[in-house]
Amino acid sequence: MSTAYFDADCDLEPSLKSLFSLKTLKWIFVGGKGGVGKTTTSCSIASRLAEERESVLILSTDPAHNLSDAFVQKFSNAPTLVNGYKNLYAMELDASYQQAVEFKLKEENSLFSKFLPDLISALPGIDEALGFATLMQSVKSMSYSVIVFDTAPTGHTLRLLSFPSLLEKGLSKLFSIKQNMSGALQLINSVSGNAIEEETLNSKLEDLKAITTSVKETFQDPSKTTFVCVCIPEFLSVYETERLIQELAKQSISCSHIVVNQVMFPIDLPSGNDQGESVLKDSSELLKLEDIPSDHSKLVEFTEKIVCSYNKLLSYSKLLYSKYYSKRNMQMKYLEQIRDLYSYDFHVAYIPTLNNEVSKIRVLIS
C-alpha cells in the first residue's frame, strides 16, 4: 500500500466529532493496552465534552491513578471540580470507596447475614462482581450529563466488562442454592428460635438481580454507553485492541471509535539519500565573515575545524533521519492494518506524536 494514504491530512484528522455529537451518551469508557495514552485521551475527551455538556465527570477505575498527574491536581473518592473548569469534575476510585459501596451483609445482626456471604464466596469472582455492580449503580445515580471512565489496561478492563454476565450466572446459582436450602433453614429456625424470614433472603437476592439487570442494560444500550479503544501503531497494542473489540462485541457493548496515538506524521524533507546534506546545505550562511581569519595558516586550520564539525553534524543528522524513517516504516505496517480492519466500521482518530511530554491536559481531540 502506498504511504500516500496516511500522508493526506484529511485521512489523519485527529477528530472524534461523531462521538461528541451523540448527545444521549451517559457513559463513555476509554481503554486499551497500558502505556498507549488512555488517561490523556480520557482527559481530552472529558475536556471537549465540558464545552458542550452541562456537567461532566471523569472517573478513574485504574488502581494506578493518573488523573491527578494529568490535571496537576489532587483528586480523591469524591467528585472534585477540575481547576480552570466550571462543569468538569474528576474522581479516582480506590479500594476504600469500593468497599464502602458494597453490600454490607456482615453488618446485619441476623442469622440470615451469616449464610449469604458464605453462599456468595462459594462462587468464584462473584464478590468482586457484586462490588462492581453496586459501584456502577452508585455511579448511575450521579447527576452528571455524561461520565468518562478512564479504565485500567486491557486485561483488567475485560474482567470488568464480564462482571454483569458473571453476576447473572452467579445469581442463578444462588437462587438454586436457596431453594435447595429451604428445608435446612426451616430446621435451623426451629432449633435456634431465630426466625430467618425467607422473604428477607428473597428480597436481598432480588435487589442484587435488579442491580445486575440495570447495569447490564445500560452497558448494552448504544444510545447511553460506548467504548473508545486507544492504541498505538505497534504489534502488541493493535493485537490487544482487536481482542478488546471482539470481547466488547461478545458483551454487546457499543464500540465505534478508535484513537491511534503517537503517530509519526511525514515531515517535509527531500527524498533520496541526501536528506542529511539537505539539512546543512546552507550551513555556510551561519558563518560570520568577521569570524574568518585572514592569516593563511589559521585559515587552513579554521577550515579543517569547520569541515570536521560539518561531517560530525552530517553523520548525526543521517542517524536521526534513519531512526525516524525506521520507526515510520514500522508504524506504516500497523497503520495499514488498522485501516484495513477498522476504517469502514469505526471512526478512527489519528493523534500525532507530540514534541513535548503532556503535563497539563489540553484538548488534543476536536
Curated annotation (Swiss-Prot):
Active-site residues, Swiss-Prot/TrEMBL? D62
Q: What class of enzyme is it?
A: hydrolase
Domain of life of the source: Eukaryota
Pfam families on file: ArsA_ATPase (PF02374)
Task: Please name the GO terms that the record assigns under molecular function.
Answer: ATP binding; ATP hydrolysis activity
Q: Which Gene3D superfamilies does this one have? A: P-loop containing nucleotide triphosphate hydrolases
Give the principal location in a single coarse category.
Answer: cytoplasm
Report the subcellular localization: Cytoplasm; Endoplasmic reticulum
Record-listed E.C. numbers: 3.6.-.-
Write out the entry's keywords from A to Z: ATP-binding, Cytoplasm, Endoplasmic reticulum, Hydrolase, Nucleotide-binding, Transport
Query: What processes in GO biological process is this protein linked to?
Result: tail-anchored membrane protein insertion into ER membrane
Task: Cite the binding residues for ATP.
Answer: K33, G34, G35, V36, G37, K38, T39, T40, E234, N261
Membrane-spanning parts: none
Quaternary structure per UniProt? Answer: Homodimer.
* Protein purpose: ATPase required for the post-translational delivery of tail-anchored (TA) proteins to the endoplasmic reticulum. Recognizes and selectively binds the transmembrane domain of TA proteins in the cytosol. This complex then targets to the endoplasmic reticulum by membrane-bound receptors, where the tail-anchored protein is released for insertion. This process is regulated by ATP binding and hydrolysis. ATP binding drives the homodimer towards the closed dimer state, facilitating recognition of newly synthesized TA membrane proteins. ATP hydrolysis is required for insertion.
- Family matches, as PANTHER family: ARSENICAL PUMP-DRIVING ATPASE ARSENITE-TRANSLOCATING ATPASE, ATPASE GET3
Assigned protein family: Belongs to the arsA ATPase family.
Protein name as annotated: ATPase ASNA1 homolog
The protein's organism comes out as: Cryptosporidium parvum (strain Iowa II)
